[in-house]
């Protein structure tokens, strides 16, 4: 059985030391992406995450999940999929500060947006974390609906962008 006191101390140390460093890094990346033009922010963050992502503990989890979902992939195909995942995730992060402008710039089109027109009693829109998942609510906003989001807060409570 794991040492409960050790786990509590480790969790406390992470909150005191690691979380503030992580929050600072995230806010710095957000600030950099915000001042860069949208295409540059997307490309730079995509390249950065493609480089750094495979060195994180999350890469192992992604590989295990990929093995469960697609066991037929060989090692080269797995590397290709995982590299694409990190690049896409970085691009999403790079685009995040610009999301509110992306629709207005004509870069985004919503397939099936007309299905939202005329709804009078509200609706649930459920989206997966595929592509830039932050854009989903703009489909409803674009046809004049109010939007409320239900989500799980970040584990890193120091960040509320």
Write out the residue ranges for each language-model feature.
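Alpha-helix C-cap/termination motif
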Residues: 35, 142-143
């Amino acid at each position: 059985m794991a040492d409960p006191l050790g786990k509590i101390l480790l969790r406390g140390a992470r909150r005191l030391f690691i979380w503030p460093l992580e929050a600072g890094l995230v806010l710095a990346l957000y600030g950099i992406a915000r001042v860069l033009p949208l295409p540059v922010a997307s490309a730079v963050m995509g390249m950065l995450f493609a480089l750094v992502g495979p060195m994180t503990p999350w890469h192992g989890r992604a590989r295990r999940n990929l093995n469960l979902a697609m066991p037929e992939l060989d090692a080269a195909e797995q590397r290709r999929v995982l590299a694409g995942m990190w690049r896409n995730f970085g691009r999403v992060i790079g685009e995040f500060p610009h999301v509110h402008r992306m629709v207005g710039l004509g870069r985004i089109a919503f397939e099936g947006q007309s299905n939202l027109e005329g709804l009078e009693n509200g609706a649930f829109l459920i989206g997966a974390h595929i592509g830039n998942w932050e854009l989903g609510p703009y489909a409803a906003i674009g046809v004049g609906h109010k939007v409320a989001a239900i989500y799980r807060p970040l584990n890193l409570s120091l960040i509320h962008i």
